A protein has these predicted regions:
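Short, surface-exposed loop/helix-turn segments at secondary-structure junctions
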Residues: 109-113, 169-183, 215, 234-239
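A short secondary-structure junction signal
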Residues: 104-108, 117-119, 139-145, 154-158, ...
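Non-heme Fe(II)-dependent double-stranded beta-helix
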Residues: 1-14, 19-121, 234, 239-254
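Short edge-strand/loop segments of extracellular domains
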Residues: 98-100, 146-153, 222-228
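Extracellular structured ligand-interaction cores
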Residues: 92, 124-130, 140, 186, ...
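Short, conserved beta-strand element in jelly-roll/cupin
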Residues: 118-138, 190-191, 222-225
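Non-heme Fe(II)/2-oxoglutarate
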Residues: 41-45, 52, 193-198, 202-267
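Double-stranded beta-helix
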Residues: 139-204
């Protein structure tokens, strides 16, 4: 799968693009089931909310066959190769649960801030890919993006939170700069399960809490170019992978076929 000229232009201008329903119902059902399984694991890679509800599970492609296939799926790999015209590797793989009633806030930040300061990533030549496992709606803690903020490059952040977060004045300025004819400088991409969102590593984003009965599980795959590999990671390997082997995509039907074999085995 490749991006259209319009999608490429949108990504360049706005810092993100949305690809509706990239994965089938059968593929999403498999991934949602696998997500429930991995979120029950008691291991360092699985972070929890204060309540004990799952918050984020990292490196799940290392202990789930289904997510291993997703990490190498051509519908995710090829668009990023197209953007950079280079081989890519997995820098980070995670599942954000945003559990119903429990999913807490993620403050305003740029991901490249952490990649550069904590991992020694030279340039923002990495892309985040979000795969919606549940329907993402305006009400259940969707990701909030500030369009065009990737053009601000690397903005100084603070360490007042487990991310390099941005202060209110900076966020306000970026939002005002991004305001369009509607007078709104923040967007919340929504979509059905199986939708994919690509966004630039310097795009400023956040997420409000989820206080609804509707969960909002999203898989995030960060792909970095091999030539831009990290040089001095201070974080655990499951937070910033140090296997820089170029990804070899699986067959396009690999995930669907795995879902089919699982259904047959369970019958």
């Amino acid at each position: 799968m490749t991006l259209s000229a319009e999608q490429l232009a949108t990504f360049d201008a706005e810092g993100y693009t949305v690809l509706p329903r990239c994965f089938s119902d059968a593929e999403v059902t498999l991934l949602r089931h696998e997500a429930e399984t991995v979120l029950k694991h008691n291991r360092p890679e699985v972070w929890r909310e204060k309540s004990g509800a799952p918050r984020t599970a990292f490196a799940i492609h290392r202990f789930s066959d289904a997510f291993s296939l997703l990490a190498r799926h051509p519908r995710l790999i090829e668009p990023v190769r197209q953007l950079f015209v280079e081989d890519v590797y997995v820098h980070q793989f995670k599942l954000n649960a945003k559990a119903a009633f429990e999913g807490d806030v993620w403050q305003w930040h740029q991901d490249f801030g952490a990649w550069q300061r904590d991992d020694g990533m030279p340039q923002p030549r990495a892309v985040n890919i979000a795969v919606f496992l549940d329907e993402v709606m305006p009400i259940n803690g969707p990701l909030l993006l500030i369009p065009k903020s990737h053009r601000a490059r690397n903005i100084d952040g603070t360490t007042a939170y487990p991310l390099w977060t941005l202060d209110k004045e900076t966020v306000t300025r970026l939002v005002l700069d991004a305001e369009g004819e509607d007078g709104i400088g923040v967007v919340a991409p929504t979509g059905k399960p199986g939708t994919v969102l690509l966004f630039h590593g310097n795009l400023v984003h956040a997420a409000p809490p989820n206080i609804t009965p509707y969960p909002r599980k999203v898989v995030y795959l960060t792909l970095n170019t091999v030539a831009n590999r990290i040089t001095k990671s201070t974080r655990a390997e499951w937070l910033a992978h140090q296997d820089f082997t170029p990804i070899v995509p699986v067959a396009d039907d690999a995930l669907a076929e795995y879902a089919r074999t699982r259904r047959v085995a369970a019958a």
